[in-house]
Amino acid sequence: DGITHETALNYSVGFRGPNGRDLISSFADYVLENDLGGEHYSDPDLTCREHPGRVEEYELERLRGMMIDMIRQPEDFKQWFGSFVTTPRHELDIAPAEPAYEEEEVVDALLGGEKLSRLSGLRVLHIGDSFFVHSEQLDTTDAEALDALCRYTSLGQEELGSGLQNPAFVSELTRLINQGYWYFEE
């Protein structure tokens, strides 16, 4: 994220989207980390054949199908993708809050007109009904307030709305601030 205060040129050096190898590798890591895909290949109709070293086309298709079925699991795929795409590709300048904020302090500051800024480079996404920050899926009950975290780089009471009355959201927001992902503007 770059911010300029006057006309400027912008150059991108070396940052590009993932390739197929990156995607497959990352998804395979996710499958292993979450102990998914534990079903074994089986072919109950297999009989002795004349050429024991030959693999039939239908056998390859069944194996390919097993692999593709892993990717077709919508919740697992969404969880992997949200984590993958919000993982930073470069080191962020994260400075956890010192001292840590209490939930009441966060609410009072925001209701008092203070604004939060998102850490530059932090990846925050809304995918379906899920929200991801820095490769982590958020668990909360206030979709509108979480959507505001994804939508705005600077936000306050107006953007967060009724989320500031939701204890689960306030707890989540306070944790994110204390981790250094958002900070109060000076």
Feature locations, PLM:
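Acidic, low-complexity/disordered tracts enriched in E/D and polar residues
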Residues: 69-150, 174, 185-186
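Short amphipathic alpha-helical interaction segments
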Residues: 163-178
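A conserved active-site cap/scaffold subdomain adjacent to cofactor or substrate pockets
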Residues: 1-76
